[in-house]
Amino acid sequence: MKKFLLVAVLALMATVSVMAKTDGQTYEPVNDLKIVNVWIQDRFHTPDVFPKKDYCHTRARTAVLSNGVVYIARSEVKEAITTAGDTVAQAVIYRLDAATGEELAPLDVTLNGEPYGAFLGVNSIGADNFGHIWIGAYSSEKSAENPFYQLNTETGELTLIATLNKGDNISRIDYFDVMGDITREQAECNIMAPGSQTANVYRWHADQGSDTFEGGFEGDICLVMTSFYPETVTEWSYAPYARMCLGSSEDDMYMGELFYVDGFNSAPALYDVTGSLIDSFEAVESSLHPEAGTNGVAEFNIDGRNFIVYSRAQYAGTGRGCQANICELGEGMSLGGMTKYWQIPADSLGQTSDGGNRVHSFNVEYSQENGSDVVTLLTFKCFNGIGVYKIGKNVSGGGEEPQPLTGDVNGDGVVNVSDVTSLVNKILGDPTYSDTVCDVNADGVVNVSDVTTLVNLILV
């Protein structure tokens, strides 16, 4: 009986450890700012947990952090029957507590009271500047319009915000960005999306209080860009991503007059609404250049300093996979003068192909901790992993880091023969597992004596 209770307690501890897992990295403070990982779920740190999650899927492409909750949108999850008797593949929004990583009840997505099952119907999810969650559906190069919705975060019901017309220059749209208020009650609303495999950028604008969206480029819906970085690029290629920047005054706060576009074969570049290239990675040292094939960028401000976070490389990068750089922008918020602070995670989220979805989601929330400003940063890479980080002068992690189970080399929460295999691979040169978990006998080195200790643990 005692042995059964001990096993049950250990199993419970292992479960808690997995749920509260951090990346285990120590990030050095830079210019009085610290960063800590609150929690992480990914193929690298929780390889036997994250791949089993319903939101680890190639149709779960984007995520957003809003009001302390992480929302992950997955299209075409499960069969549902409409009142007309039709079968559709219903979309689901998965929710996690941003403070702990604990799963909250998912939202089955509906439209007009019916299961919502449009093809890639929740391809793009985000939050406006007033906490409203929006959903942008995928649309092909043959579709002249794109539906855009608000999500009810209690029920999963969608409300149509606008049917966005692409005008005469039609191209495929994968991902959107929003600045302002999608309800137009508290501010204007601007919606942007670059066109896939084109040089198109679409923009729609509605004044505060207006029911109508119109072209956001001085009345035009689409602007064809002519300047890129690198200069050899002539279009965005696959699944590009746009991100508008907050203005510097009350009058222009939500105009989104400056915006980044990050394409498959280009680095993030900053434009204005005339199409002029304002800034790029041209003057950035080469070691900080992102690799081709991954799209994602965001800005934030803390302690009077301006930062950029961008996708460094995707699963096939020369690094360890799906990481992001966090850099302080240079004088005048220039890219060329930026200073790297950290790479997150320092090791990896994962190195598994997501089928070419390209997008890497980032966004932030602001709060205070221990009397100082704090930025909470979400990083999400489809089919590879998700993590929440905090940045500030006095930040601390998401509670005390659970102590690893001695002998649990592969981090799956149990000690068995699979850990022996992992340990032997480590000794033979596999860098996947840390020295800390592999030093089973705690003598300061990892060698064959640790294998003996581990085998004895299993046989006890």
Language model regions located:
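Blade-loop segments of beta-propeller domains
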Residues: 88-131
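Beta-propeller blade signature
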Residues: 88-101, 145-156, 201-208, 322-330
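Short glycine/acidic-enriched loop and turn motifs that connect beta-strands
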Residues: 76-84, 139-144, 195-199, 264-267, ...
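Beta-propeller fold detector
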Residues: 24-48, 103-112, 158-167, 211-229, ...
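Signature of short aromatic-glycine-proline-rich micro-motifs recurring in repeat-based ectodomains
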Residues: 48-66, 113-126, 135-139, 166-193, ...
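Conserved beta-propeller blade signature
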Residues: 69-72, 132-134, 187-193, 254-261, ...
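Cellulosome-associated attachment modules in secreted, modular CAZymes
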Residues: 395-460
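Loop/turn-rich, solvent-exposed surfaces of beta-rich toroidal or solenoidal domains
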Residues: 281-348
